[in-house]
């Protein structure tokens, strides 16, 4: 089949709007992002006014393990606490839990940059997060003073840890693992196979751009 014969995908909904919102917690403003991303109707536009709408947490991450692979995590952040005030952050030894040979660095559970803490707040923070009841795990891949682990160990530890998970008695299956890696890396894609050949062979390259500072950046996807 020729690539030209493949029909264009039809979007479910298309919205435009100004995402420059404040993080005020007046009314329902703390959840404007969750509402904005799950509604086919553009509810906010350029307005920062409270629309009187609440975000219904039908799915809140209960029974799910979320892993942030980044610059680390601020351990004592109040956003990780559950409704009882207990932190959902699980400070495990990745080498011990995965069975991978190695030593976890000292000060592994720190974040001198802040990016990892920011990302997990979006993922699972109790105020602005999507999965506010999920368990939180952190792997420091980009750290300072030798507190990070290598790429190879990160992959091996994640696989080994997930494979070693016990059955969750609440569900009868292993807890799902969701891993977030919010960072960039540069490489070249081999152009020997043409884009048509790549797509028709069911192989995909996911290239995404975002979260840059400032307004002068041009994104190419």
Question: Where are the predicted features?
Answer:
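Glutamate identity and glutamate-enriched acidic tracts
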Residues: 8, 15, 40, 84, ...
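Short, flexible active-site-adjacent loop segments at beta-strand->alpha-helix junctions, enriched
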Residues: 3-6, 43, 72, 142, ...
